[in-house]
Structures are given as C-alpha cells and as structure tokens.
C-alpha cells in the first residue's frame, strides 16, 4: 500500500470516528433534553406523551391535598387560563406554597394527570423562570407575570 493511500485511510478513519463521536454526543443530549410547557400548552396537546417534560406556573390557592401517607401530595398548577393536576411523592421544597411559582418535572398520564418526579419552587419573592413569566403574560396575566420576574 502506498503512503498516500495510508494517509487517506487514516483521514477517512479519523473523520468516521469524529462523526460517530458527534452522533453519540448529540444522541445523549437529545435524550436528556427536557422541555418546558404551561398548563395551557398541555391542555392543547402540545406536551409529549411517554416522555419527561417540565410544567410550570402558579400553585392554585386551596388546591394542595396531602395524602394520609404523609409523602404524597396533589396540587393544581395554573397559568390563569388552564390548570393541571400534579401528583408528587416525596419531600417538597421549603418554599413550596399556594399562590407561588412552581416547576414540576415528570410525565403526563393518559387521563391528563401529571406525575412529577421533581418539584422546584421559586427561590425568592422576585424570581420566576423566564418561560413561566412569558407563559403567564401570554395567558392574559401580565400584571402577575410582571410582578414575578
């Protein structure tokens, strides 16, 4: 084999390895990508089925129900236009309260129940994830979204 053919073979093998590595990285990134949806988007059918995603909005006042086991909690997340029932089994953040911002990550069941694996509460009185503030503004609650930037 000539030296020129060896170099060409090494270049082709290197490019193939680089392409394979890039494909593996992109595949792993795609599997770990989690999208954010509002209750209105979930109600409109825009949220994926059988795939984890995040839903965010405000915890509806009077909607928190704690089960007898002391670990399971059910509550409504609203963007003022729609609301979504969320079930969570685990310890809630200290800042989790009615009327406050929340982001839950989990999956949607066939009967429109969101089963959360993780619940995140806003960390101070002035913070709201940009996606949630935008969603509230789009849902017709600009004063609420502006107050919670």
Swiss-Prot record:
First-listed, main subcellular location of the protein, grouped into a coarse class: membrane
Subcellular location: Cell inner membrane
One MF annotation (Gene Ontology) recorded for this entry: heme binding
GO BP field: cytochrome complex assembly
Record: residues binding heme: 123, 127
Sequence intervals crossing the membrane: 8-28
Membrane topology reported for the UniProt record: Single-pass type II membrane protein
InterPro entries (UniProt xref): CcmE, CcmE-like_sf, NA-bd_OB-fold
PANTHER family found in the cross-reference section: CYTOCHROME C-TYPE BIOGENESIS PROTEIN CCME HOMOLOG, MITOCHONDRIAL
Family that this chain belongs to: Belongs to the CcmE/CycJ family.
The protein's role, per its UniProt record: Heme chaperone required for the biogenesis of c-type cytochromes. Transiently binds heme delivered by CcmC and transfers the heme to apo-cytochromes in a process facilitated by CcmF and CcmH.
UniProt-recorded name of the protein: Cytochrome c-type biogenesis protein CcmE
Species, as recorded: Polaromonas naphthalenivorans (strain CJ2)
Gene name in the database record: ccmE
